[in-house]
Structures are given as structure tokens and as C-alpha cells.
Regions:
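Short loop/turn segments that flank or connect secondary-structure elements
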Residues: 1-100, 104-235
């Protein structure tokens, strides 16, 4: 996928310049703190992964979807959803038993763009439980010229990643008349089970009906944009 190549080249150049200032990025192999976050992606990225799933990956994915559907019965707002996802739903279903990404070559733009300027422990901290002094110490340690404040993740790579995501969604909108983004694992599962990308869909309602049939037409999970005017659709 060309957008992935563009981001990888951009990130490589950015890292070279950043490390030349003797500053560190703490991401490394078998570090998977960020894999507990709800990963946002575009549907074309999910399609690319769904096409090559192994039996083990499919099983882990289905287990995750079942846990997620149960959790959604208790959630109504984005903040609660993101917190529950991070703390209770378990890591990304594509994380293998050794703590490595099993879809690394085709991982989405949002994963590629996430670079940590602080040690891994900060990627899993529940900031709502930190006292005032710990929060203050954390914030004072951040380089505001580099990070997406108030997080410790690099802003430049995330900004470029979002630009590339928008390009993918615009291309999908032009080709199909609708576009879909949101929870990456949910979209991979949806494509694996419904082959939505291969449907000949004549109306926006058909897309919404398919999401509803799979119990996934939820604004916390997916963002469906329909029609030439870019109308948003979600329950």
C-alpha cells in the first residue's frame, strides 16, 4: 500500500533527524504497551489484513469481537469506551504469544505513526489515577515542540499519518460512494465475515444495514460516511 510506504519513509527521515539531537524514541521489538489502545484505521487497510488471516489470528479476532460486543452494552461515551478498551478488553488480537505484531508488514498507518518519546511504562499508565505531582512531573518532561500535547507521542508522524488516512478515505468515497473508518480489529473481522468490500452496494442504507446485521453499527466503533456530500451515518 503506497500510503504505508510514504509514511515509513517520512518516519525514517524524521527519526534520523531526531536521533541526531541525541534524543531517544523508546519503541522497540516486543514492546506492546500501545497495543492495548483502540487502534483507529481505514477500511482499505482492514481489507488488506483480512485477506491474509491465519486460523489462529481469526480465532483471536473473534474472541476479541465477542468481548467487545459485551462491553458495548455498558458504554455510551467515547471516553468510557477508550478506558475500558485499554484496561479490560486485552491487547490487540493481532499480538502474538511473544509480544510481537503478527501483521507487522501490513499494520495500519496509526500504528506506524505512533512513536513514544517516553519509556514504555508511560504507554500503559492510567493518568486518572496519578496524583498532581506525578502528572506535573510527567508534563514537564515532555518536549512540546515534538509531542502531540498532552501525550508523549510524536506529533509529526501522527499528523502525516492522518493525512494519508484521509487520502485513502477520499479514494474509497470516490470509488464506492461511501467510506468507513474506526476500530481496526472490528473492520478486519467485518471484512473477513461479510466481504463488505466486494459487495455491489447501490444505496447508503445497504451499508448501514450490513453493519447493523453484524451488530457493529455503533458510533463508538465505526464512522460511516455516505454519499457525495459526505453524510455521516451511525446509530
Amino acid at each position: 500500500m503506497n500510503q504505508h510506504d510514504h509514511l515509513d519513509k517520512f518516519t525514517s527521515a524524521w527519526l534520523t533527524n531526531y536521533r541526531a539531537t541525541e534524543k531517544a524514541i523508546y519503541c522497540c521489538e516486543h514492546c506492546f504497551g500501545c497495543c492495548h489502545l483502540a487502534v483507529h484505521a481505514t477500511y482499505p487497510e482492514a481489507v488488506a489484513v483480512a485477506e491474509g488471516l491465519t486460523g489462529t489470528q481469526s480465532k483471536r479476532l473473534t474472541d476479541y469481537i465477542e468481548r467487545l460486543k459485551v462491553a458495548l452494552t455498558e458504554l455510551t461515551d467515547l471516553k468510557s469506551y477508550l478506558k475500558k478498551h485499554r484496561q479490560e478488553l486485552g491487547p490487540c488480537p493481532f499480538l502474538d504469544g511473544q509480544g510481537s505484531c503478527s501483521i507487522y508488514p501490513t499494520r495500519p498507518l496509526s500504528c506506524r505513526a505512533l512513536l513514544s518519546t517516553r519509556p514504555a511504562v508511560w504507554c500503559t499508565v492510567d493518568f486518572s489515577k496519578l496524583d498532581h505531582w506525578d502528572k506535573q512531573a510527567y508534563e514537564s518532561s515532555l518536549d512540546r515542540q515534538v509531542v502531540a500535547w498532552p501525550t508523549h507521542f510524536v506529533a509529526a508522524t501522527q499528523d502525516f499519518g492522518r493525512e494519508l488516512e484521509n487520502t485513502l478515505l477520499e479514494l474509497m468515497q470516490k470509488e464506492k460512494g461511501w467510506s468507513l473508518s474506526g476500530n481496526f480489529a472490528v473492520m478486519v473481522w467485518l471484512e473477513k465475515n461479510s466481504q463488505l468490500s466486494k459487495h455491489h452496494i447501490a444505496t447508503n442504507q445497504q451499508v448501514s444495514d450490513i453493519l447493523t446485521a453484524y451488530e457493529l453499527n455503533n458510533h463508538l466503533l465505526l464512522d460511516l460516511t455516505c454519499g457525495s456530500q459526505g453524510t455521516k451515518s451511525a446509530e
